[in-house]
Amino acid sequence: MADRFTKMHGLGNDFVVIDARVAPVEMTPARAHAIADRRHGIGCDQLILLEPSTSADVKMRIFNADGGEVEACGNATRCVATLIGKPAVIETLAGMLRVTPADGGAEVTLGEPVFDWDHIPLAMPMDTRDMPVAWDELEHGAAVNVGNPHIVFFVPEADAVALDQLGPRIETDPLFPERVNVNVASLDGENQLQLRVWERGVGLTQACGTGACATAVAAIRAGLVRSPVTVALPGGDLVIRWAPGEPIVMSGAATRVFDGETDWAQFG
C-alpha cells in the first residue's frame, strides 16, 4: 500500500505533510532530510508529521530540511489548521497552539513571547531588547523566543542586506547554543514591516511565520509600530497582533498544492 502525503505552503514556505495518526510513520533526521531534498526527494522547507495526541486534537512534529526536529513553525501550523478544517488545539514541542481556519488560511494563537536571555537561549547574560552585538552592518539585535529562538535586526532597507552570507554566520555563532533564526526588517509604512528571514536549518525562505511574530513583537517592544502589524515577506503578508502580557496571534494564508503517494522506505 502506498504511503500518502500532502504538499502545502504558507506564503511560499513549503511543507510535506504526513498524516500518521492512523498508520504510524517512523521518522528519523536522515529520512526527513532525504524527503526534503529538492533534487532527489519530494522537496520542502520542512517536513510535518501529524501524530495522535493525548492532550490535544493532534500532535505536530516539525523537521527542518537539514533533518533536525524543531519546536515551532507558524506557517506549517496554519497549513495543518486548514487540513483539520475546524477550531482545534495542536500539540507541539513549543506547547499547545490554538488554531481557527479562515477563508484561504488560518489564525494561530501562540504563547507569550519570552525575552529572558537564558530562555532564548543565549550563551551569556545580555539585554535582549538591545544586544551589543555586530556582524558587519547588522548591529544591536533584539532577541525573542516565540517557541523557537530569533534575533531581529532593524535596518533602513531589508533587501539591501546580504542575508545569504550573514545568515549562516549568525545562525551558528557560539552566542546561540541552539542556533538561531535571523530576521532583517525595515519599516514599510505605518504599522507595516518588510521582513527577510534566514531560517535555522533551512536557509533563506519565502516566509517564516514565527519570524514574523518575533519581528512584530520586537518592533512593538521598541516603539516602532503598534498592533496589529502587517509583515510583508517575499511570499506575501502576515498580520500579527500582540500586547505585553498577552499571547501572539498570527493570521495569514495557507495553500494545499497537491496530494501524493510514495514509499517512505526508499528514503532510508
From Swiss-Prot:
Residue sites binding substrate per the record: N13, Q46, N64, G74, N75, N148, N181, E199, R200, G209, T210
GO MF term (any one): diaminopimelate epimerase activity
Enzyme Commission identifier(s): 5.1.1.7
Signal peptide coordinates: none
Annotated site residue numbers, Could be important to modulate the pK values of the two catalytic cysteine residues: H150, E199
Compartments, as annotated in UniProt: Cytoplasm
Pathway(s) annotated for this protein in UniProt: Amino-acid biosynthesis; L-lysine biosynthesis via DAP pathway; DL-2,6-diaminopimelate from LL-2,6-diaminopimelate: step 1/1
GO cellular component entries: cytosol
Catalytic residues, chain numbering: C73 (proton donor), C208 (proton acceptor)
Keyword field: Amino-acid biosynthesis, Cytoplasm, Isomerase, Lysine biosynthesis
Catalytic reactions on record: (2S,6S)-2,6-diaminopimelate = meso-2,6-diaminopimelate
Superkingdom: Bacteria
Amino-acid biosynthesis is among the record's keywords: yes
SUPFAM superfamilies linked to this entry: Diaminopimelate epimerase-like (SSF54506)
Gene Ontology BP annotations: lysine biosynthetic process via diaminopimelate
Database matches in InterPro entries: DAP_epimerase_AS (IPR018510), DAP_epimerase_DapF (IPR001653)
Reported function: Catalyzes the stereoinversion of LL-2,6-diaminopimelate (L,L-DAP) to meso-diaminopimelate (meso-DAP), a precursor of L-lysine and an essential component of the bacterial peptidoglycan.
Family statement drawn from the similarity comment of this UniProt entry: Belongs to the diaminopimelate epimerase family.
Cited NCBIfam families: DapF (TIGR00652)
Assembly information from the UniProt record: Homodimer.
Name this protein carries in UniProt: Diaminopimelate epimerase
Organism: Sphingopyxis alaskensis (strain DSM 13593 / LMG 18877 / RB2256)
